[in-house]
């Protein structure tokens, strides 16, 4: 499937409630994981306040998707994101089709203050975000 103005390619991970979960086949940028909160935020709150979430759902979404394509995207998780990072659970469910040549962020959840990432061997790990830069591999949920 090709979506977006620069023809990013996507891998189908699974069907989910009448929609299809896709992961971008490549890293589209690299960032540190930062939040707007002072101190350490954990899990869901860290994602809600993160610079990566803001970038994906503003600059990335508007640059790479037409209005028609945006209308096909289903809002995901309690933050209503149209573009997001996979959670550790979503990654675990599709790990056999996910290429891990570089490190890339996963979406934090739960109560850990250390966001997860995928290492070059394909393992999901955690470390404190402010010190490291990892790749961004967007995920989308598309209405069938």
Describe the residue ranges of each PLM region.
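Collagenous Gly-X-Y triple-helix signature in extracellular proteins
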Residues: 1-144
